[in-house]
Amino acid sequence: MIQMQTVLEVADNSGARKVMCIKVLGGSHRRYARVGDVIKVSVKDAIPRSKVKKGAVMRAVVVRTAQGVRRDDGSLIRFDDNAAVLLNNQNEPIGTRIFGPVTRELRERFMKIISLAAEVL
């Protein structure tokens, strides 16, 4: 469950390390985001000479949550961290590599992220 002020790891090579959720997109008073939801983030930590700078406001898709994902068969997939992948305005990933596992729930809307990820659960 991701809400405003949640700090997330960045799971791509865009250059950002940590981002903070500043808005959950997809509704006027939407409070929480889950895996596959798009959020507005502010870059809090970035490596030098990278594609994104500290303080930049961007869109991101949530790829891992500590709360986990409940599947239709009743299984639950949980992760150790909350992570997101940065997106441009066309909802395409900025980075060219995805680090760590991602879930199959991203398949409908973010096939590019699934193809870049090394491990899909």
From Swiss-Prot:
SMART domains: Ribosomal_L14 (SM01374)
Annotated GO biological process: translation
One GO CC term, this protein: cytosolic large ribosomal subunit
CDD domains according to UniProt: Ribosomal_uL14
Keywords, in A-Z order: Ribonucleoprotein, Ribosomal protein, RNA-binding, rRNA-binding
Top-level division of the source organism's lineage: Bacteria
PROSITE patterns reported for this sequence: RIBOSOMAL_L14
Transmembrane segments: none
GO MF annotations, alphabetized: large ribosomal subunit rRNA binding; structural constituent of ribosome
Task of the protein: Binds to 23S rRNA. Forms part of two intersubunit bridges in the 70S ribosome.
Subunit architecture: Part of the 50S ribosomal subunit. Forms a cluster with proteins L3 and L19. In the 70S ribosome, L14 and L19 interact and together make contacts with the 16S rRNA in bridges B5 and B8.
Family in the record: Belongs to the universal ribosomal protein uL14 family.
Protein name per its UniProtKB record: Large ribosomal subunit protein uL14
Taxonomic classification: Bacteria, Pseudomonadati, Pseudomonadota, Gammaproteobacteria, Legionellales
